[in-house]
Regions:
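Conserved G/P- and acidic residue-centered "switch" motifs that form tight phosphate/ATP-binding loops
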Residues: 44
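Canonical Radical SAM [4Fe-4S] cluster-binding loop centered on the CxxxCxxC motif
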Residues: 1-18
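Short, solvent-exposed loop/turn segments at secondary-structure boundaries
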Residues: 13-14, 101-105, 168-172
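Short, small-residue-rich loop/turn micro-motifs
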Residues: 1-5, 92-94, 160
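Flexible glycine/acidic-rich beta-alpha junction loops that bind and position SAM and/or redox cofactors
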Residues: 136-137, 157-178
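Radical SAM/AdoMet-radical enzyme domain recognition
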Residues: 17-39, 47-149
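Short, solvent-exposed loop/turn segments at secondary-structure junctions
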Residues: 7-8, 48-49, 74, 165-166
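A short, flexible beta-alpha/helix-coil linker loop
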Residues: 6-11, 95-97, 163-165
């Protein structure tokens, strides 16, 4: 989230994407060189078929984490924990439905993400929440998100809106510096 539109972008053909076996080989070859952590990111890693099987393939002495938008977390949290995932970071920029849907360009609701976070906690996963704060969009969400997770073991991090090229409509005026 949000939906990104990449006109005229040449995506890799499926056969050019590394298989889980190839990714595991790369990870295993880096462990003797000091690799201690692996983070699965996206797009959305929970859209990847059989992601739990991939996690099981990774050396279990690693700290294995995932960053997700949280929309599928309720469905997969238990299996993720059983497969060896240690931590999950959930992107959540608002908990009021209007801001959540506008910022994410989605019809989904923040309640879906909040249920996923709670399911992940109950499954034994360590949970962090990242909230990207944008002036004129969701600065009012800082207090609401803080209140929602105060007194829980969920770590909340507020992040500056960053320039990542031409895909997110970044403007300096939307940055609230930390």
């Amino acid at each position: 989230m949000p939906r990104e539109h990449f006109e005229n972008h040449d995506f890799l053909d499926k056969q050019e994407i590394l298989s889980y076996e190839e990714l595991t080989l790369v990870v295993e070859s880096l462990v003797p060189l000091g690799l201690a952590k692996v983070r699965l990111t996206g797009g959305e890693p929970l859209l990847r078929r059989d992601v739990c099987d991939f996690i099981k393939m990774l050396p279990q002495e690693l700290d294995i984490a995932m960053t997700t938008n949280g929309l599928l977390l309720e469905k997969y949290a238990h299996d993720l924990a059983l497969s060896g995932l240690n931590r999950v970071t959930v992107s959540l920029d608002a908990i009021d439905i209007e801001t959540f849907q506008a910022m994410g360009d989605t019809k989904d609701t923040p309640e879906t993400v909040l249920r996923g976070i709670e399911t992940a906690r109950k499954a034994g996963l360590s949970v962090k929440v990242n909230c990207v704060v944008r002036a004129g969009y969701n600065e009012h969400s800082v207090e609401k998100i803080t209140e929602r997770f105060i007194g829980t073991d969920v770590v909340v991090r507020f992040i500056e809106f960053m320039d990542v090229g031409r895909t997110n409509g970044w403007t300096l005026g939307e940055v609230i510096p930390s």
